[in-house]
UniProtKB/Swiss-Prot annotation:
GO molecular function: magnesium ion binding; phosphoenolpyruvate carboxylase activity
Enzyme class: lyase
Function: Forms oxaloacetate, a four-carbon dicarboxylic acid source for the tricarboxylic acid cycle.
Species per Swiss-Prot/TrEMBL record: Aeromonas salmonicida (strain A449)
Protein name (record): Phosphoenolpyruvate carboxylase
NCBIfam families per the UniProt record, alphabetical: PRK00009.1
Annotated keywords: Carbon dioxide fixation, Lyase, Magnesium
Residues at the catalytic site: H138, K543
Family annotation (InterPro entries): PEP_COase, PEP_COase_bac/pln-type, PEP_COase_Lys_AS, PEPCASE_His_AS, Pyrv/PenolPyrv_kinase-like_dom
Keyword Magnesium on entry: yes
Lineage of origin: Bacteria, Pseudomonadati, Pseudomonadota, Gammaproteobacteria, Aeromonadales
GO cellular component: cytosol
Amino acid sequence: MNEKYAALRANVGMLGQLLGKSIKDHQGQAFLDKIETIRQLAKSSRKGNEADRERLLETLRTLSDDELLPVARAFSQFLNLANVAEQFHTISRRCEEQVCTPDPLEQMFAKLKASNLSQEAIIQAVRELDIDLVLTAHPTEVTRRTLIHKHVQLNDCLEALELSDLLPRERDKILNRIEQLVNQAWHTNEIREQRPTPVDEAKWGFAVVENSLWPAIPEFMRNLDERLQQHLGVRLPLDAAPVKFTSWMGGDRDGNPFVTAKVTAEVLELGRWMAVSLFYKDIKELTSELSMSDCTDAVRERVGDHPEPYRALVRELREALRETQEYLTAKVQGQVSESRDLITTTAQLREPLELCYHSMHACGMGNIADGMLLDVLRKLACFGIHLVKLDIRQDGERHGQVFSELTRYLGMGDYAEWSEDDKQAFLLNELNSRRPLIPTDWEPSDETRETIDTCRVIAQHDPDAFGIYIISMAGAPSDVLAVQLLLKEAGCKFRMPVAPLFETQEDLMAGTAVMERLLSVDWYRGYIQGRQYVMIGYSDSAKDAGMMAAGWAQYAAMESLVALAEASNLRLTLFHGRGGTVGRGGAPAHQAILSQPPGSLRGGLRVTEQGEMIRFKFGLPKVAIHSLNLYTSAVLEGNLLPPPKPKESWRAVMEQLATVSCDHYRSIVRGHPDFVPYFRAATPEMELGKLPLGSRPAKRKPNGGVESLRAIPWIFAWTQNRLMLPAWLGAHKGLEHAITDGQKSVLEEMSRQWPFFRTRLEMLEMVFLKADLWLAEYYDTRLVPQELWNLGKQLRQELADAIQIVLQLRPQGDLLDDQPWIKESINLRNPYTDPLNVLQVELLGRSRSHTETLHPELDQALMVTIAGIAAGMRNTG
């Protein structure tokens, strides 16, 4: 056992014992003994004891129907508690340096000062920081909000236990509260009864802001400001917002028919209501703080001879916020309310607060001004009165459909059949025209009306409420111009940024040519005014070509887009659509940022944060502060001390790796006749549809095959059976080919000197430690028809070969030896995840052999194993 993580193991042990007590009180000692037997057998099986492995299988196979659900719940709940303990450990006082970078910003400023950079260059880079974290609903965020809330409270209790001067009765009180929370969790159904609506998802996002990001931002800003003062002698401006938040929840309608224009409008109002409510609380508290009487003439002019000038100013704000809150409450509830003197812009709040701030500093009260008042100003700069900006995303085909219907109605032929040049000519002509294009008597289809209504919602709201408009499957300049024309026709008076999303390997490779053609359009250059966004899709490109080929396609696309932006004198912001898993572009934030091409961060960083990753990275204020520090230090390093440009020899090897790995990946996923039936038999893909996860359907087309399956359930299914196929398939063949071709020394050099390549290998190592050949084989022998066994055997052999190939490229040691914390984290969970896998196989077998409807408890048990394995793997889709 690794003594280094003794504090973590002690907390895991304590929570496990309390869960055991809850189980015993509810199910009896005999049942708890059975759970403990299964746990010990799983640990022994992990160590290679074949006899205990057989006993484990026998014990789980012979469970009665009414035992399956509580056994699944016991292991699933333990894994959730282990995650709570681990998340706490990363912010604990006892956290080891290998786990928690003590202060990433402090280390970064020291590193920058030690470099040859001028002080002015560093200050400029800090002032130009532009990090936009985009919160997205996640179809595989399997943990219910009610359980997340209990887990947050558990975290608070673990923190309180660390205080060294606790009295015995205080300690007992905390331990009793922990016991209550564990007991509450055990008696709470972990699977939600109904699929969440898009509005439910948006409320979940707002709850993350309220509970975690709202308190985290002022602390993060204070830390950054102090480091800047300490190292460079300057402070951040009052309106500095190096980090901002955007949301897709209620705005992302690509493939989700439940996100309508009405839903988007409702989510926008809810966001405003939440922001006003939070600022009202803060301003109310601030009123009690600002009792001072000294002030500048500028404040006196506003409040007259009031004895408490700051309170007088802030009370006016408080009343305006209260009125706005009442108005928005009525509006959200569908009631008509009189429009009064409402807060409609961030400036209405900022101006009087800045007046107070400058007055206090002028009157020798800078220390007071830099307290809660500065915190409110920092929140205003970050969140504004909309809380988060809302992105809109729609499939490019839907915009084309509007113009197809319209041109047919107008007798102009079918827009869909026109050449790209004809489409552009039509769109540009209409963009330059002053007359409306859409006739008032036109009756479009429901889908087309919905697309137009969405643009009208955008036109009716404040520009500050929105981020950007993203077009999925964008392949031509007309895709972008079509959206701009729709916005014009809807009466939109502001220039909403429109970003094409390049997501397949082919789209990524063609992306720069598309942008080049678009930028050659004079009207478009005038519209964007020197600022362009492009979204890079990680999930679909990996599903399309495999992780290695997709990674290189993403890198090459970014590199050529950056070169185009420089040549065109544009500020380009690359928007990274990454997931939490390796198969969807996931990697620790710092590594992912530093493995991007040099120059790709000049226009800022914009990246999606999804479902379960939002919870792991931003679910607690202290965890959120640490994550924000990591992002900031990584972006500063990426801009000021960028990684080297790849050598020509490295590029040649990567081209070869990408070609070989993509060919092999596609030969299996697209070319093997048995692949689709094998995938459906060997994973719970068909059963995943039953799980009431996100609001979005799992498939783009209900009757489609693997190609229509969304990237998230595709990854989720392979994670469940522990083959982890999308995260490695193809990569090993590329590496093997390069080694056989005499390029091993080049690969080793790439691993040492090039963050992009090193990150790929590290991600493979993590995946290999989570994968399990024995369990993958067990799924096959129990669930897969015998005529498909050969494919399963081939894939497992390829996984075993892949592990050996990656080990060859390690300087020494075993998988993840140089990342002991991640290794410890995976090893801690594996013995608790393994029984859930065996149980899942048992439940899938019973479910598939029942022609009639399965007993609800067995259905529930299957859902619990899916959620539990997701918790054990720590990243789902």
